[in-house]
Amino acid sequence: MKRILIVDDSKLMRDMVAACLRPLGAIAFEFAGTGLEAIERLALASFELMVLDLNMPDVGGVEVVEFVRAQDRLRALPILIVTTRGDDESRAHVLAAGASSFLAKPFAPAEILEQVRRLLAPAGAIGRAPA
């Protein structure tokens, strides 16, 4: 079973992201309401993906991305940034910090589902016909 860490200071947004991703099937969701809580969870467990809000009250999304990329064990973790800051400058900044992908709020459920499917796909599997 794949594990996804959803990090957002809004419980409503955490629940909405999880609901959007339920069609993926066998996924276990864990939640963090702050950047610091996300770092603590990452230290204790392994995840296949992190969906991360950019703006949080303690440790921001960019700082969490930088922390993850500095850890050997976590370096390859795909990180999808989900934020209200959808401008090109914010996108470029988080991708340069090491985020894997970026999605601006508000988004359609199909948009986040497609992004997560792409990030969870094995390398080289995108566009391949199923065996």
Residue ranges of each PLM-predicted region?
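His-Asp phosphorelay/catalytic-motif detector in bacterial-type signaling
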Residues: 46-48, 73-78
